[in-house]
Amino acid sequence: MIETSEVRVDLGDHGVLGIPYVTVVGEAGAGPHLTVIAGVHGAEYASIAAARDLLAELRRRPAELSGTVTVAPVVNLPAFWARTPFVVPLDGKNLNRSFPGDAAGSAAERIAHAVTERLIKGSDYVIDLHAGDLPEALEPFVFYDASPVEQQARELALAYGLGHMVRQSSDGRTVTGSTSAAAADLGIPSFTAESGECGILARDAVDRHLRGLRNVLRRLRLLPGAAVAFEPPVEHDGWIWMRTADAGWWQPAVATGTLVAEGDLLGTVSPIVGGAPTRVTAPAAGVPLFITSSPAVCADGLLLGLARPVNTI
């Protein structure tokens, strides 16, 4: 059975938003319910394309599927139509900092609440697909949250086969209000997968997501065949999100995916006209997994995410 439906969100003065999703119920027998979400950030096109491609594949092969897969390719439709990075343009809030949401809150909080209630709850597993947004260079990685179900989340994240994997502690989460954190708090194994950068619809980034999705489906026995054991990733114990105190012109000095030592130069932030640049150095050894690729940075603007490795690169 293939069913198309909508998550209906009352946005108050902004009307009612309908977020489309499709549920494919397999014909090969019983199995778990996996939900795949994408487009939490509306300009991360590689991840959205991967969700669409996965859905097209599942539509063609329900007879091979054991269990249920729900796919929501674009949950942040206001950002998608407006081509807006990072936030819901109706309120300027980051949807992936708004979960589990609030039915009486702002637009982002209402969308997050509806997605939590209609898509996350009731799932056995959740995968949230992302990519580097419009001004964001990115090294492919997965991350999951510390929780009572983290071992299951870790096993699925490993099956996704990306080169870096971050475990985020539940004590002082760097990323709060995310889909995967909300799922973990509900006891649902979940992880976030990142592939693609700068809002570019690159085929290799899409295929990297699809390779991981297919392997997780086999790992969960939703699809026939043995899951592939990929080369172990570089594992990271949390990360440091580095920001600039002042607005200015950001010039990175490192590339994503490269190991840096404590004290290494990561980049500089300079005044638009004249003045000495401010050096940005690594507070600890780590690997930049994403870097703001735009030279324009606001005060308190995010520069990069430095992940702390716990095994050898």
Predicted regions and their residues:
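Structured catalytic-domain cores with a bias toward divalent-metal coordination
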Residues: 1-313
